[in-house]
Amino acid sequence: MNEFVNTLIARRSTKKYKPDMLPKDVLDQIIEAGTYAANGRGLQAPIIIAITNKEIRDNLSKLNASIMNAPIDPFYGAPVVLVVLADKKVPTCVYDGSLVLGNMMAAAHALGVGSCWIHRAKEEFELPEGKELLKSLGIEGDYEGIGHCILGYPAADPAPRAPRKENYVYYLD
């Protein structure tokens, strides 16, 4: 099988991480892969916020947990959180941001880094705390939180992949 296709098929969500920080060059490659995701009309609506600061990461984790009303770390101990947001003025913003997340997760797997998509970014950045984070970075505009790509080195083997469901694909010949 083609190496790239195998990378896509072999990727799994990682839900237990070592505390070790990723080297900057590895993180930068993952982020760069995200910036080259396909996007509607080439408008590049998404933005990526790379969080490696533990205090900020932990505060965002608490905010995310409060949205789902659960006393857990929704980021599973991952040391890096990449938040993807997208400009609401662009009609394809959610799709574009989703492709950014997918590219980053595939790149992470190719580099031996675990990843998982975590939801509730939309709700986070509708709250005052989320808006304040954007303001502190000088980010202006009307952005919607699309998702989080958490990253780190896996502390356990991923779960085996589930078989694909029947009737996943239909061909019209």
Please report, for each region that a protein language model flagged, where it lies by residue.
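Acidic, surface-exposed loops and disordered segments
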Residues: M1-D173
